[in-house]
Amino acid sequence: MLTGRLPQQGRTQPGSTNQNYLFHLDNLSVEYGSICALKSVQLTIYPGEILFLTGPSGAGKTSLLNVLGGYLEPTSGKAILPHQRSTKHFVSTVFQDLRLLNKKTCEDNMWMAYDSSLYGNKNEYFREMEDLSRLLGVYDHLNRKIDDCNGGLKQKVAMIRALLSKPTALLADEPTSSLDKENSYRLFEVLNHFNHKKGLTIIWATHNKELIKQFPGKIAHLDQGRLVYSGHACFI
């Protein structure tokens, strides 16, 4: 829980934005009928940042991720997204609906991200898939059908597929909800490596305060649709 008086210098103020951003939300609101899911959100996310979205259930984290992913249009305000700034930018998502093919194997689902323009050949892609599968403990299950996998294994498959697409940014909504502590940390260690070595921007909605404390990053804390704090995670 966020406690005490939060400093305001971490907040993004209108008109003060460095133009080298990936995402920029300007006074953005989202309404579902009479329900206001996001209220006047002002947020800028820069390349290579790790941003944890925090807040109680119903605070607007999923709605914010859907806006950032281009799946949800704001009711008012403006959202500038990576693909609008450069065709080189690509955003991968791992949301609660993992969009896996249940009758296909783990490996089949990972092949869905293959793009010949990103890899020299299929062998290169498979080696990357193999490496990530070993790191996350999925390798021995590559031939298992998704229908026969538990929730944690499904989340890992979805994450590997997302990383194989070589995204500029990764949006994740509680992607460790079915994983134990050890596997959660292992997953984020892999993501942290991608952040440091490849400049991957990570935006991660989570209730896991211990995970946030273990990895460097910023937080954007939402409450009742309002962004009440954006800045360093030392106020967790």
Where are these regions (language model features)?
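The feature captures the beta-strand-to-loop junction immediately N-terminal to the Walker
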Residues: 54-56
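Helix-to-loop junction immediately C-terminal to a conserved catalytic motif
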Residues: 69
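Q-loop/switch helix immediately C-terminal to the Walker
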Residues: 104-116
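Conserved ABC ATPase "signature" region
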Residues: 123-141
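Conserved ABC ATPase signature
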Residues: 145-153
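Hydrophobic anchor residue at the start of the ABC signature
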Residues: 159
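Catalytic Walker B motif of ABC-type/P-loop ATPase nucleotide-binding domains
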Residues: 170-173
